[in-house]
A protein has these predicted regions:
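Active-site neighborhoods and metal-handling regions in enzymes and metal-associated proteins
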Residues: 2-6, 10-419
Length: 419
């Protein structure tokens, strides 16, 4: 459940980037021990040939759906298709991929060298100056390619000014969802993508194994997150912060603003991941520190572990994604939780899509009718939360194959051996 809205998560949980001086001495010493960790050798990054195949697939899907072109703003999809890693601002940089022919990049004149440096596919770069309208370049391109009578696809995260100003430049322009195109490509991971996600998962598990035995009484969530982050970076993963919850905060999926420190019998939750060449991991582990788990803690932990297994049995190619969530929730209801999303119980979806982004379509959630297919990747995190007491979340990701789901990380054996 490692949420991509990093600032929001830190605001809620009270966990943030912390200076070394603000860490406890125990945490600082533990971070110093990461020197013994050696970075792994990752698989190669996504190359030109794979990106060209992605563009070709997108074009086939556009033609099948009667779409003339798609406009891709900065973000994971722009990186996915072009290799350009950029940011969103009032100055438009975007790719326009037509249903046939070579794509173009639109960018400010002064940004051209930087865009050209990272562009990973053949594409003409068209520039605009500060006193010019960038959407005119898009309109002109559509006219040149004789695509003005076909709709233009845009992602649902595109900002309003883009379609609005395109319509001003191209009378009668029709804007439709690019979901059938972009999701049709990004939801199905290739072997190269799965290898990068496997590498990211391996790093996160190794970081957990390094950090778990070094948790000490008096440590804060920020202390523990800093330990995990230092280990992750030492092992070669990109890390921009995780979610660590302690005590009663574990009863709330994204934590609480109340400060908590580790003490004997504390319920502790790690929810962290990393990136390898742009691909993500997302893993959660729950355990009791410094004491044997109570019968209630052990029972809930084992029920969540059973929930993960139920999800894996339900995840079969051709079944609706929502059926996985339904299977877990039905079992939890039989065990006295819920019903549905009510508490105590499972108040969030069973899982989310994952790839270049921590959260991607589609989700393992009630009502999702998209059929599971080989290459789809998901988290499996059917946590159980007891408000005012504690919560248990175990999270491991998996990818679909024709023979069934396959784990990226192996679930833990018990609450006593959580990593």
């Amino acid at each position: 459940m490692r949420t991509p809205e990093l600032t929001r998560r830190r605001m809620i949980s009270g966990t943030g980037l912390v200076a070394a001086a603000s860490l406890t001495g125990l945490a600082s010493r533990a971070i110093g021990q990461t020197a013994e960790l050696k970075p792994s050798v990752p698989p190669p990054p996504i190359g030109r040939a794979e990106r060209l195949a992605r563009v070709a697939k997108a074009q086939r899907l556009m033609r099948a759906n009667g779409i003339g072109a798609i406009l891709i703003e900065p973000g994971a999809s722009l990186d996915y298709f072009t290799g350009v890693q950029w940011w969103r601002s009032e100055r438009l940089t975007a790719a326009v991929i037509p249903a046939t022919g070579e794509p173009i990049m639109i960018t400010p004149f002064f940004e051209r060298p930087s865009v050209a440096e990272s562009l990973g596919i053949p594409a003409e770069i068209r520039t605009w100056n500060e006193d010019e309208e960038p959407l005119k370049l898009v309109a002109d391109f559509l006219r040149e390619r004789r695509l003005t009578r076909l709709p233009v696809g845009m992602e649902e995260t595109n900002r309003f000014f883009i379609p609005d100003r395109l319509k001003q430049q191209l009378a009668g322009a029709r804007i439709v969802s690019a979901n059938p195109i972009v999701r049709g490509c990004r939801m199905i991971k290739t072997a190269a993508e799965i290898a990068l996600m496997q590498a990211a998962s391996d790093i996160t598990i190794a970081a957990f194994r390094h950090a778990w035995p070094q948790v000490r009484a008096g440590m804060s969530a920020s202390d523990i997150d800093a330990m995990i982050g230092a280990a992750t970076r030492a092992l070669g993963g990109g890390y921009d912060g995780g979610l660590v919850l302690v005590g009663e905060a574990t009863a709330y999926p994204h934590g609480s603003k109340k400060p908590h420190v580790v003490e004997r019998g504390s319920n502790v939750l790690f929810d962290c991941g990393c990136s390898v060449h742009g691909y993500q991991s997302d893993i959660s582990r729950s355990f009791v520190w410094g004491a044997d788990a109570t019968p209630e803690q052990r029972r809930v932990w084992e029920q969540v572990a059973a929930g993960q297994k139920i999800a894996m049995v339900a995840a079969r190619v051709g079944r609706p994604a929502g059926s996985v969530d339904d299977a877990v929730r039905a079992a939890y209801t039989r065990w006295g939780y819920g019903p549905g999303y009510k508490l105590p119980g499972l108040s969030h979806r069973t899982g989310h899509g994952i790839g270049m982004e921590i959260h991607e379509p589609i989700n393992l959630v009630h009502g999702e009718t998209t059929r599971l297919a080989p290459g789809m990747c998901f988290s499996n995190e059917p946590g159980i939360y007891l408000p005012g007491k504690f919560g248990i979340r175990l999270e491991d990701c998996f990818h679909m194959t024709a023979a069934g789901p396959r784990w990226f990380s192996t679930p833990p054996a018990s609450i006593d051996l959580p990593v």
